Amino acid sequence: MLVGWNLRIEGTDICADVVEKAQAGCYHRIEINRGLPARFVVRYFDHLGEDWVVKPEVKKMCHFRQANLCGPVLPFNRAEDRFDVIFLRNVMLYFSQETRKVLLAGIHRVLAPDGILFLGSSEQPADPSLWTALLAGGTCYFRPRQPS
């Protein structure tokens, strides 16, 4: 599948039901058809009646847990919790400016120095001094700025 890659996918949600659904990896046809190209569906999911189930080789790379990203400490604090890519899409829409600032400071700490942060299209870092905005193929993403 991704031969030679050391890939780990970590997912969090504050809602236990959402985490449970992600762990099950089973999605109805209607859910799958919302924005996921057919070539990815066929490659990474098995068809089971009206549902699509994440293939075992993909599922073993995925770890989900219930977590509150607004808490005082991010759920990823260990030295080995350095991420190359973080997708934090449409998460901060409901947070205050101060909460966004605290969350993104924590994200900055766990993102590898050459890592990439993807936010939702209407989201921006609360503290732009920590981030460099880049554009590639119409997609905006952010890299952490390093202290000088």
Features from the language model and the residues they span:
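Composition- and surface-driven signal marking solvent-exposed, interaction-prone regions
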Residues: 78-79, 100-103, 131-134
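Core SAM-dependent methyltransferase catalytic element
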Residues: 127-148
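A short glycine-rich, Lys/Arg-flanked "PGG" loop and its adjoining helix->strand segment in the class I
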Residues: 101-113
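Extended basic-aromatic, gly/pro-enriched interface segments that bind polyanionic ligands
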Residues: 2-87, 91-95, 99, 125-126
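Conserved beta-strand signature within the Rossmann-like core of class I S-adenosyl-L-methionine
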Residues: 113-121
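A structural micro-motif
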Residues: 5-7, 115, 131
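Residues that form or immediately flank small-molecule/cofactor binding pockets and catalytic motifs
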Residues: 14, 69, 122, 138, ...
